[in-house]
Amino acid sequence: MSVIKMTDLDLAGKRLFIRADLNVPVKDGKVTSDARIRATIPTLKLALEKGAKVMVTSHLGRPTEGEFKPEDSLQPVVDYLKDAGFNVRLAQNYLDGVEVNEGEIVVLENVRINKGEKKNDPELGKKYAALCDVFVMDAFGTAHRAQASTYGVAEYAPVACAGPLLAAELDALGKALKEPQRPMLAIVGGSKVSTKLTVLDSLSKIADQLIVGGGIANTFIAAEGHNVGKSLYEEDLIPEAKRLAAATNIPVPVDVRVGTEFSENAPATEKSVTEVQADESIFDIGDKSAEELAKIIKSAKTILWNGPVGVFEFPNFRKGTEVISNAIAEATANGAFSIAGGGDTLAAIDLFGIKDKISYISTGGGAFLEFVEGKVLPAVEILEKRANG
């Protein structure tokens, strides 16, 4: 990956425009999950240590361009950074210039409020670029989108580089996908085969073993001819599931946990996969299946994990994902390289307290999947172009 890295630049006195991913959940004006902010803090500290004048921005939620609403503001992120000890303030009208003092961080208000952001309007890209001496792309989570704050600004800024977080993401994903230690295992969960089909296809060519979970696994169970009751599955994709199962080693659950309603306190019944009734839905894998998968996980040398194997948010349907999480942590402790990505996966990692037991946790959802699919990420492509003149 030939991009300029922020870590290699002399930044003393330079105006830095950092595009971070601070798109965090907010409730009643407070940040409710701080993983993305925590991941960005080392970049901010490094920029300050190097003597830069630091501006940082991000999108938050899905605001209407050109319309400011208080709930779309990055103010809760500013409050969080203040509490973390930073000298920080919010700038709302910054497109015609903003004063930045040494030692402070200026958070530029939600980029998605700016007209032309999503369409990558060149005029907006030029305005962002005019604010800085160096543009730092550090938002892997939006690297798959060519927008004014991820692509346009990189075209026009005097220098465009990759921040530490983006560089680490690309290195870790490269390690897992380009030269994996064997055997390589990929775990893909989620509700639909259709949304992960290209990912499953790509991984079936790289991985020695695939594990599918969640609604995806239900389609594979149905492909084996079993009744899945009211479970979420995709009948039209059964032929695809059969094709993938024939091409790659994909174990299908032998036992499952079912419920008759989708609710937090729904009672769970464990049974053989052959015994699912018409009024039941599969919400988790059973103990035997979890044990089998844990064995497979513990023998892997590279593990790529995207998605849970059950509705782990509900206590009665949590066990399968918990067993798998702990098996990944154990394999990692024994020398495997593990990389995890995707919102649900990160929530599971938090819930089961294994954050420090995974080799690398990706902050990207869609970008993580597109990289796995082998797609070019526009925001990375422009950094490569700029690095190579």
Curated annotation (Swiss-Prot):
Gene Ontology CC terms, in alphabetical order: cytosol
Compartments where located: Cytoplasm
Catalytic activity of the protein: (2R)-3-phosphoglycerate + ATP = (2R)-3-phospho-glyceroyl phosphate + ADP
Pathway: Carbohydrate degradation; glycolysis; pyruvate from D-glyceraldehyde 3-phosphate: step 2/5
Stated family: Belongs to the phosphoglycerate kinase family.
Quaternary structure, from the entry: Monomer.
Identification of the protein by name: Phosphoglycerate kinase
Gene from which this protein is expressed: pgk
